[in-house]
Design a protein with these regions (language model features):
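Extreme N-terminal basic, low-complexity initiation segments
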Residues: 2-11
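Rossmann-like AdoMet
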Residues: 12-75, 87-125
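Conserved glycine-centered beta->alpha loop in an early N-terminal alpha/beta scaffold
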Residues: 78
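Glycine-rich SAM-binding Motif I of class I
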Residues: 82-86
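Short, catalytically relevant binding-site loops at active-site mouths
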Residues: 110-112, 162-163, 181
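S-adenosyl-L-methionine
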Residues: 118-166
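A short acidic, Gly/Pro-enriched loop at the edge of an enzyme's catalytic core
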Residues: 165-173
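A short SAM/SAH-binding and catalytic strip from SAM-dependent methyltransferases
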Residues: 172-182
Length: 182
């Protein structure tokens, strides 16, 4: 993990139960910090600053600082490391809004929880959220849903070309993310 990130948590297999029977994305790690999906030869987030990339493309690009409100629904193609979700929840909490946001993500190649946590060590801005979700990623991947006081997160595993057909919820915003060519 990043040696200069003093808030980095130790990721252990005891805390993050591995998933079985799923499509492993087979990762390479650039500088032991940035996950790259071998199948697509593409990093999961910007090599320069993934958090700033998410803020620019998704949060600011969708004007979410003005649009997020109680009951706001976001859907996403590609959960990846959870960076888009954590960044959205970060913005929601920065706004000190009352109520709840609803976030649904479709993922064909889910990362192991231990891989998600390793990748999240790159983002000191999200360290409190990373710590909060540390023990919950395994539960999300097993159950498909997490719910807290200010969010509901739903993860739908499988190829979105098939799984999205059962998704009949209207949303306020889509995050269309993916590997090159996206």
């Amino acid at each position: 993990f990043s040696p200069d990130n003093n808030r980095a948590i130790e990721v252990t297999k005891e805390k993050c139960k591995p998933l079985k029977n799923y499509n492993n994305p087979k990762l390479l790690w650039r500088d032991d910090r940035i996950p790259i999906a071998q199948k697509f030869d593409d990093p999961y987030f910007s090599l320069d600053n993934g958090f700033e990339e998410v803020r620019h493309v998704f949060l600011n690009g969708n004007k979410l600082s003005n649009r997020l409100n109680n009951g706001f629904k976001i859907a996403e193609l590609g959960f990846g490391t959870g960076l888009n979700f954590l960044s959205t929840l970060w913005l929601w909490r920065q706004k000190k809004q009352k109520g709840k946001i609803f976030y649904t993500s479709f993922e064909a190649f889910p990362l192991q929880p231990i891989e998600m946590l390793k990748a999240q060590n790159e983002f000191p801005e999200l360290s409190d959220l990373k710590d909060e979700f540390y023990s919950l990623w395994s539960k999300l991947l097993e159950k498909g849903e997490l719910s807290g006081n200010d969010y509901t997160l739903r993860l739908i595993l499988g190829d979105a070309r098939r799984t999205i057909k059962q998704f009949d919820t209207q949303v306020d915003c889509w995050f269309l993310d993916g590997f090159s060519p996206a």
